[in-house]
A protein has these predicted regions:
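S-adenosyl-L-methionine-dependent methyltransferase catalytic module, highlighting the catalytic core
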Residues: 93-97, 101, 107-234
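Conserved N-terminal segment of class I S-adenosyl-L-methionine
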Residues: 1-74, 78, 189-192, 202-245
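A conserved beta-strand element that flanks and buttresses the S-adenosyl-L-methionine
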Residues: 84
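Surface-exposed amphipathic alpha-helices with a cationic face
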Residues: 35, 103-104
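Compositionally biased, low-complexity repeat tracts
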Residues: 56, 106-107
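A short His-aromatic
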Residues: 87-91
Length: 245
């Protein structure tokens, strides 16, 4: 039988005192740890559970009671530093719409932290060998498929971590003999944790230091230097002036 996921998405983050904005979608168990890791952050939470606000959660959380799979999130584009949600796309009718939609609410330096159940895990394959499939209402993914989905949803950098559950003796050997590749213990990885960034790491620092308008001005100045615009303009003016003399 499938096991429940152990919440480990926060391993992608380092505690700090920055005034971040962090949105948690359904995975409310992260809220207490987030408050400890980021004491100055504004925490937001989205859930379809009407009783969620009565749960043991940190004070000051900004709530939205809605089903994110069917109702658009009511936030400003480019608002959040992080969006955190386990198994976000497992029940989505159109997962790319959800993933791309979430990316719009992230700052250019922001990241989407999520996870997915690996369809190549030995437990899924073993059930299929026995004539069963228990994920009729869920979407399971391979690592490559999930990464491609995120790249197609406007994320520029993908990092993953594994949550493993070992196979019974000799099962992996049987699967490999049958033709299943097992690169990086994929067949024993039940869940993948994913950090999807809106920007490449080498650009994220630059974007955090300068506004969009400032970066556009820098690009124009660099282009003028690169193509020696001032010199070319001066030579053109001299040529035009010479023709009229």
């Amino acid at each position: 039988m499938a096991e429940k996921i152990r919440p480990e998405l926060l391993s992608f983050l380092q505690p700090n005192a920055a005034p971040l904005r962090i949105l948690v979608v359904e995975s409310l168990s992260y809220l207490h740890d987030l408050r400890e890791m980021f004491p100055q952050a504004e925490l937001y939470a989205v859930t379809a559970d009407m009783d969620a606000m009565e749960m043991d959660v940190p004070a000051g959380v900004h709530w939205q009671i809605l089903d994110y799979l069917s109702v658009p999130l009511p936030y400003t584009h480019g608002y959040f530093d992080y969006i955190i949600s386990d198994l976000t796309l497992e029940k989505a009718d159109n997962p790319q719409d959800i993933a791309a939609g979430f990316s719009m609410f992230l700052k250019e330096t922001g990241a989407f932290l999520t996870s997915f159940r690996n369809i190549r895990h030995w437990s899924v394959l073993k059930n299929l060998m026995e004539g069963h499939y228990y994920n009729i209402v869920s979407r399971l993914y391979t690592r490559a498929e999930f990464e491609n989905l995120l790249y197609a949803s406007f994320y520029k950098s993908i990092r993953v971590q594994q949550q493993k559950r070992e196979a019974p003796t000799s099962l992996i050997e049987r699967l490999v003999t049958a033709g299943f590749e097992n690169e990086l213990d994929d067949l024993e990885t039940e869940f993948y944790f994913v950090r999807a960034d809106r920007s490449m790491p080498e650009l994220a620092l630059l974007k955090s230091m300068y506004t969009t308008a400032e970066r556009e001005q820098m690009v124009r100045l660099i282009h003028r230097i690169e193509y020696d615009v001032e010199t070319l303009a001066a030579e053109l003016c001299e040529k035009i002036w010479a023709e009229f003399q």
